[in-house]
Amino acid sequence: MLFSVASLPLSETPLAADVQFAEPSPSATILPGIGRNDDRQPVNPADFPWRALGRVQTALGSRCTGFMVGPRTAITAAHCLFRERTRLIIQPRLIHFLLATSRGAAAGVALVADFTIAPGYDPFHESESAGADWAVLTLSAPLVREGEYLRLDRTLPPRGTPALLGGYSKDHIEIIEADLHCLITEQIRDARGGVLLHHTCHATSGTSGAPLLFRLGSGEWRVAGVQIGSVVDHAGGIAVPAAAIPTSAIGR
């Protein structure tokens, strides 16, 4: 999904006032969320944290990014589970999760057995319910072992937190590309009061569902948020805070 940001809203400013879903100009040559300078670089899918990422792929041809939070549990953006034109839900049996896939080879592949979409997410009113744009996937088989998945952080990261974000972009769908040097800049709100994180990470279409990552002082990687959209015409994007996803939804 795409956002148009006229001016970055402050923490208590409703999302609908300044940040709206928008379509890019047909003549635009700048990728949404990238801008004129592309800071993305390929990363090794065998390295952590990237080996916990995967491509969420439907039989209808749509693709997003997701990440493992348990042996057979993954998270992605809720809008990835709806048909783009009709907004009808896509059945789990039509969705695959390809773990750490790169140039046609994946570390593991599983069907989605079931999924849970966040209460309050409305595919017909995406911008108003953007703070609920997350979903938990239950896979048909375990793809990772204990300790090989990512953990959600339960706090809201402060402004200026160093971050990184990688995923399967539409312009390079066979590899993980990541911006390794970006920042979480603001906490904003959608029209229904849902909290969102604005960041400066270079990421475009296809990365929806990717983890917005930061590192604890101990060196442990944590998920600060779930990427849900890119900013039109320049670098940056919007993520749902990981803290918005209840522990009960992922079973831990």
PLM regions: where:
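Conserved catalytic-core segment of clan PA serine endopeptidases
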Residues: 28-48, 62, 82, 87-144
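C-terminal cap/linker of serine protease catalytic domains
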Residues: 145-148, 170-171, 224-252
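Short conserved beta-strand and strand-loop elements enriched in small hydrophobics
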Residues: 54-56, 93-103, 162-166
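Catalytic nucleophile loop of clan PA
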Residues: 202-227
